[in-house]
């Protein structure tokens, strides 16, 4: 199967936390949600993929190339959005864009202007003046303006109100359809996954519990059902029951 991203046996150790043998893959034109509670290892996984932290072992392949050996080349083909980032907070969007576009050989100004208009962004505003949702939209506009084939997003919907979050998830679906790219995004909000993902990877305490297409993922947790459950479990119920089982084990120990 063709993949745009393959993560194989990534390991990273910190005092009190270990990312252990993390593996999953993402196919073209798909959206994968990376789910887990706060502190499960989602952000560390994304940072290890991008070599923002150096994994102790494992490999990452993007576009059939070893990312760590071809990092500069691969980064020309990806877009990265980390929620909560306030880079150049006092600079106008136009100034940030002028700096950013110099790093990409295939920068498309017409594409940039299309998304600035589509997202109703005002380039004369300073970055710090944007709402959380508008900041994410601006960062998406930058990523899409160099025709990114893979978007890696860390908690992009965190802190957004329900309306803004729903709008952003709709944008993700539109992007995958119109721009022919794939998206990997982390979240602890299970409703995000219900609305827009094709695939789900669930991380618990630095380990991947399951990684599969959404239907297969849901079926793989049917053992958590009780006699009182008349229908399939929701993603929220799966996560709550899985984490509750861990709490019970900790108490028993």
Task: Please report, for each region that a protein language model flagged, where it lies by residue.
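Helix N-cap at the start of a conserved alpha-helix in ABC-type nucleotide-binding domains
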Residues: 162-164
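ABC-family P-loop ATPase nucleotide-binding domains
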Residues: 82-138
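Conserved beta-strand
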Residues: 7-10, 17-27, 58
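The feature captures the beta-strand-to-loop junction immediately N-terminal to the Walker
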Residues: 35-37
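Catalytic Walker B motif of ABC-type/P-loop ATPase nucleotide-binding domains
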Residues: 151-155
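Helix-to-loop junction immediately C-terminal to a conserved catalytic motif
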Residues: 50
């Amino acid at each position: 199967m063709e993949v745009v991203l393959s993560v194989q046996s990534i390991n990273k150790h910190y005092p009190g936390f270990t990312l252990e043998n993390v593996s999953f893959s993402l196919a073209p034109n798909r959206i994968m949600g990376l789910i887990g509670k706060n502190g499960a290892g989602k952000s560390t996984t994304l940072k290890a993929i991008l070599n923002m932290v150096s994994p102790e072992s494992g490999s990452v392949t993007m576009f059939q190339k070893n990312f760590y050996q071809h990092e500069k080349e691969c980064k020309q083909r990806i877009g990265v959005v980390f929620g909560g980032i306030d880079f150049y907070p006092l600079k106008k969007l136009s100034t940030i864009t002028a700096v950013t576009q110099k790093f990409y050989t295939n920068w498309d100004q017409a594409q940039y202007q299309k998304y600035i208009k589509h997202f109703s962004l005002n380039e004369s505003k300073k970055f710090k003046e944007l709402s959380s949702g508008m900041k994410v939209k601006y960062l998406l506009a930058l990523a899409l303006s160099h025709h990114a084939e893979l978007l890696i997003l860390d908690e992009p919907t965190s802190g957004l109100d329900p309306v803004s979050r729903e709008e952003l998830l709709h944008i993700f679906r539109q992007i995958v359809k119109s721009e022919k790219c794939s998206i990997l995004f982390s979240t602890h909000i299970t409703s995000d996954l219900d609305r827009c993902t094709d695939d789900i990877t669930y991380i618990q305490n630095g380990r991947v519990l399951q990684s599969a297409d959404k239907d297969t993922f849901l079926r793989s947790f049917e053992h958590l059902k009780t006699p009182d459950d008349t229908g399939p479990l929701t993603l929220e119920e799966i996560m709550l029951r899985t984490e509750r089982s861990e709490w019970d084990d900790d108490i028993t120990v």
